Regions:
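ATP/NTP phosphate-donor binding region
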Residues: 1-47
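Hydrophobic residues at beta-strand termini and immediately following loops
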Residues: 24, 86, 184
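Short, charged beta->alpha transition segments
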Residues: 45, 68-74, 192-194
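Short glycine/serine/threonine-rich phosphate/pyrophosphate-binding segments
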Residues: 1, 63-69, 99-103
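Short Gly/Thr/Asp-enriched flexible loops that form oxyanion-binding sites at enzyme active sites
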Residues: 59-81
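Internal gly/pro-rich beta-alpha loop/helix module
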Residues: 85-155
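Accessory alpha-helical/coil subdomains and C-terminal extensions
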Residues: 4-15, 128-195
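Structural motif
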Residues: 54-55
Length: 195
């Protein structure tokens, strides 16, 4: 949360050779504090700027990145432009950071013309936003795609797409979420009274 988007990009000057980047900072907070109201703010910013850009890259903390990717997938349905979400396990100013790789890869994906919709770009993988889950807090390969293959992989900042994105003739933007929804995992022996 302490770096501005412009400061982040200064660590990765190669991105400027990929595309022209305009930065917008919607909020700066630890991702553990994100709420559905923040997701709606991001979706509204995407809607307001959708016609002006070819793609979007969102820098995000890893603790709730998968939740944000899923929420945005439902708030911005059928997007025909890439909306790439990325972050890092280690801060960008560390020698051993994964931030520079992930940020560059996210911009490669956003500029490729091969991807669309909300995806997580992390550790050389492109994961569909509704299928991503953080499965490891200690590894650079922190995210997994649950019950669905990766959309693409990246090697040396080259994209190799496996699955074509699903798009609609025009994206559908939503601006409401019901915050009174709970995820209840059923296990054998669960008392029906719980529901």
């Amino acid at each position: 949360p302490e770096l501005t988007p412009q400061q982040l990009l200064r660590y990765v000057p190669a991105i400027s050779s990929l595309c022209r980047v305009d930065c917008k900072s919607l909020f700066s907070l630890d991702s553990t504090n994100i709420t559905p109201a923040h997701w709606i703010t991001v979706a509204q910013a995407l809607r307001d700027n959708y016609a002006h850009y070819d793609g979007f890259v969102i820098s995000h903390g890893t603790d709730t990145m998968a939740y944000t990717a899923a929420a945005l997938s439902y708030l911005v349905q059928g997007a025909d432009k890439p909306i790439m979400i990325t972050g890092a396990q280690k801060p960008i100013n560390y020698d051993s950071t994964d931030s520079k790789l992930n940020l560059t890869d996210a911009f490669v994906c956003a500029c490729s013309g091969q991807l669309a919709g909300v995806d997580i770009v992390f550790s050389g993988r492109v994961i569909l936003g509704t299928r991503a889950r953080k499965t490891c807090s200690k590894s650079f390969a922190a995210f997994s795609s649950i019950n669905y293959p990766d959309l693409a992989i990246l090697h040396d900042h080259r994209l190799m797409r496996y699955i074509a994105p699903d798009t609609l003739p025009a994206p559908l933007f939503y601006d409401k979420l019901d915050e009174h929804v709970a995820l209840v995992k059923m296990v054998p022996g669960t008392d029906p009274e719980v529901l």
